[in-house]
């Protein structure tokens, strides 16, 4: 026989009006905030990733692929010089 911890049951929580009032506001708000974060380009600025039109420049149209096992540092320096 288990004791009572004083917590409400899950079924009691999800059937309450208070739960749905709170979550009907917060879940769409989080979705809209995430959409704005990505659509305004702020996500690119915060995380430092290039925008889709910045992956390939006019001077560099090839994929920056490291092919050498022993000269990988030189290849990496060559790729980063073009930025």
Curated annotation (Swiss-Prot):
A Gene Ontology cellular-component term: photosystem II reaction center
Family annotation (InterPro entries): PSII_cyt_b559_asu, PSII_cyt_b559_asu_sf, PSII_cyt_b559_CS, PSII_cyt_b559_N, PSII_cytb559_asu_lum
PROSITE patterns documented for this protein: CYTOCHROME_B559
Requisite cofactors: heme b
Function: This b-type cytochrome is tightly associated with the reaction center of photosystem II (PSII). PSII is a light-driven water:plastoquinone oxidoreductase that uses light energy to abstract electrons from H(2)O, generating O(2) and a proton gradient subsequently used for ATP formation. It consists of a core antenna complex that captures photons, and an electron transfer chain that converts photonic excitation into a charge separation.
Subunit structure as annotated in this protein's UniProt entry: Heterodimer of an alpha subunit and a beta subunit. PSII is composed of 1 copy each of membrane proteins PsbA, PsbB, PsbC, PsbD, PsbE, PsbF, PsbH, PsbI, PsbJ, PsbK, PsbL, PsbM, PsbT, PsbX, PsbY, PsbZ, Psb30/Ycf12, at least 3 peripheral proteins of the oxygen-evolving complex and a large number of cofactors. It forms dimeric complexes.
Positions that bind heme: 23
Protein name per Swiss-Prot or TrEMBL: Cytochrome b559 subunit alpha
NCBIfam families named in the record: cyt_b559_alpha (TIGR01332)
Family in the record: Belongs to the PsbE/PsbF family.
Cofactor: how and how many bound: With its partner (PsbF) binds heme. PSII binds additional chlorophylls, carotenoids and specific lipids.
GO biological process: photosynthetic electron transport chain
């Amino acid at each position: 026989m288990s004791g009572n911890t004083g917590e409400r049951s899950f079924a009691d929580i999800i059937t309450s009006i208070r739960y749905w009032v709170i979550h009907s506001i917060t879940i769409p708000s989080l979705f809209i905030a995430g959409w704005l974060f990505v659509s305004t380009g702020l996500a690119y600025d915060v995380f430092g990733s290039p925008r889709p039109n910045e992956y390939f420049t006019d001077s560099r149209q090839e994929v920056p692929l490291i092919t050498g096992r022993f000269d990988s540092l030189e290849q990496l320096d060559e790729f980063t010089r073009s930025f």
